[in-house]
Amino acid sequence: MEHKEVVLLLLLFLKSGQGEPLDDYVNTQGPSLFSVTKKQLGAGSREECAAKCEEDKEFTCRAFQYHSKEQQCVIMAENRKSSIIIRMRDAVLFEK
């Protein structure tokens, strides 16, 4: 194998280990959380919302909801184990 091929394979291997932003979350259609510690942010996609959850410094983000019609992202410190669940038809809940 030539040096270039080895480098290319190594780069592909390293890139594949990063995964997608949503891979760390379990998503459920329908539930919404009643959360005291939360932030409402604008986001153009679920992936962008996941990135905002990961990057938040004010609290440990354990879940987020993305509302595609409004392009609204709600990041929360609680998850279904520590909060009350409310049913919402258009909500998708992502939890760690």
From Swiss-Prot:
This is Plasminogen-like protein B. Keywords: Disulfide bond, Secreted, Signal. InterPro entries: Pan_app, Plasminogen-rel. May bind noncovalently to lysine binding sites present in the kringle structures of plasminogen. This may interfere with the binding of fibrin or alpha-2-antiplasmin to plasminogen and may result in the localization of activity at sites necessary for extracellular matrix destruction. Gene3D superfamilies: Hepatocyte Growth Factor. Residues 20-96 form the PAN domain. Residues 1-19 form the signal peptide. SMART domains: PAN_AP (SM00473). It holds the Pfam family PAN_1. Disulfide bonds join 49-73, 53-61. One of its GO terms (cellular component) is extracellular region. The gene is PLGLB1. It is found in: Secreted. The keyword Secreted applies.
